[in-house]
Regions:
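Subset of outer-membrane beta-barrel
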Residues: 3-296
């Protein structure tokens, strides 16, 4: 994850649904709201939602680097919601080498950890959110930083051939904040802010069948070692609000392009989503994602 980025955890996926739908965090988000789109939670008739996810890449000789996410959403008043979450990335074990090239009796276990807070507000067709994160990264020594983001969504409807289409537009500016600073060495590494834009179209064929099309683009706003431009497209078929089938594609200049396949289901407030991302370049890897949650 995170080629060229001083915080690889930022490149991890937090939602199995989002990951396979072109990696687009759009207005139609259904889970992991703090990391996908907090304003989308206010469109649901829910007071609380708790979600957890895990991203599983292939195992390497040094171990398997797993990415965990846990988040909760609370609508404490009409059109207002608070969010809390945490992300954790670890699993690799690296042997230390001495100056003579031989192993020494010390092992490095790198990890990344964040704690995150967010707030969202909705009025008529508009939604607004802000969030902040504390990031800690440890390799040989520990580094930390604080990052912030904000976004806006617009939701409305139109009619196409007598069918209702729900559409949404979403924009986010994220990763704005201080450089990553390592305490012991006082070395600093700039974090590049990003801009994300997306559009969602959900066609209700009838009461049982819906199709959702997502289009998105993103990129860094400042020059740096992790410069990238990305675009994605996703298609989701929903049956009777119980079963979802998903297909998506995303391309990023810094990483390989990927094909996403996914399935999800929900019943009695419980949802479970599986996603598989197939890397389409010789140097890329395939990853499995699982997201589960409960709404009440």
């Amino acid at each position: 994850m995170g080629q060229g980025s001083p915080l690889p955890l930022l490149e991890g996926n937090t939602s199995a649904r989002t990951a396979v739908l072109g990696n687009i965090r759009g207005a139609s988000a259904k889970d992991m709201f703090l990391y996908t789109n907090p304003t989308a939670f206010l469109t649901k008739e829910a007071t609380f939602q708790v979600d957890a996810s895990i991203e599983i890449p292939p195992k390497l000789p040094e171990g398997r680097e797993l990415f965990y996410t846990l988040t909760g959403a609370w609508s404490f008043a009409t059109s207002h919601a608070l969010f809390v979450g945490a992300r954790y990335n670890a699993g690799v074990k690296v042997d230390m080498m001495g100056s003579d090239g031989n192993k020494v009796d010390k092992v490095i276990r790198p990890y990344d950890l964040t704690t995150d807070l967010g707030y969202a507000y909705a009025v008529e067709h508009w939604g607004f959110f802000a969030r902040g994160s504390y990031h800690r990264r440890k390799v040989l020594v520990e580094g930390e930083t604080y990052l912030f983001g904000a976004g806006i969504s617009y939701l409305n409807q139109y009619t196409l051939f007598g069918k209702v289409v729900d559409f949404g537009l979403h924009a986010t500016v994220d990763r704005v904040g201080a450089p990553l600073r390592y305490r012991a060495s006082n070395d600093t590494y700039a974090i590049q802010p990003i801009l994300e834009l997306s559009a969602d179209q959900c066609l209700s064929i009838n009461e049982q069948h819906q199709l959702t099309l997502l289009l998105g683009a993103s990129g860094t706003l400042k020059e740096g070692p992790a410069n990238y431009r990305a675009a994605g497209v996703g298609l989701e078929y929903s049956y009777n609000k119980l079963l979802d089938l998903r297909l998506g594609y995303d391309y990023q200049t810094l990483r390989s392009h990927t094909l996403g396949l996914g399935i999800g289901g929900q019943l009695y407030g419980i949802h479970l989503d599986l996603g598989y991302r197939l890397g389409l370049a010789s140097y890329s890897v395939n990853t499995l994602m699982v997201t589960a949650g409960y709404t009440f």
